[in-house]
Structure formats: structure tokens, C-alpha cells
């Protein structure tokens, strides 16, 4: 009975990524970010972060790129995608003060709409564990 209790507890305990999984994810995230995101001419921010999710075996990458063009128009974009397969899970685009896209799609059938950068970042952290 004690063994069954330990087994049940182990199933409910979240697994953490090993150092090798984290490194594999970080390396692939860097590679995919640099290959898929040409640095804009007027980039203010051109960065990414990654998170390896052990339950799904997915390496999530979140990019954040901000630019200011010659007319002082500010653009901010974030994307969350799988570093290995390229599937996009979330996107946010703000041009000037207008949010033109803000969606988080945990599954192909589900699409959560959001309204602000803060909403997007909160949802992305909750759904995928990846943060700025």
C-alpha cells in the first residue's frame, strides 16, 4: 500500500527538465531564432527566451522584437513557437498604440484572444511556461 501511495504521488509531481534537455532546447531555440528572425534595421529589441516542457516534450521559444522606424512609429511583436517543429502557438503585434493581433492557441482548435501585451505575456506564461 505504501508503494502504491509513492507511485501515485510521483505521477502527480511535476517533472523538471534535465540540464541536458534545457541545453538542447536553448541551443535549438537560439538556432531557430537566428535563422527565422532577421534582425530589423531599426531594432530596439531583438531577443528570445526558451522553455522545455517535459510533459509535452516541446521546446517553446518566445521572441520579442521592437523597432522604431524613421517616422518614429513603434512596433512590438512577440511570437511563441516550437523550436524544433516550427509550429506557432501565440502571437502579438502592436503598431503605434494599436494592437493588431493578440492570440494564444494552446491547441489547433482553441484560440484565446487577448487585448494587451500584459495579457499576452500572462497567458503565454500560464500556457507554455515561457517568459520574457
Where are these regions (language model features)?
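Mature extracytoplasmic domains of secretory-pathway proteins
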Residues: 43-93
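Periodic self-assembly scaffolds
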Residues: 19, 23-26, 86, 95, ...
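Secretory pathway export signals and precursors
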Residues: 21, 55-57, 98, 110
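Bacterial N-terminal signal peptides
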Residues: 1-5
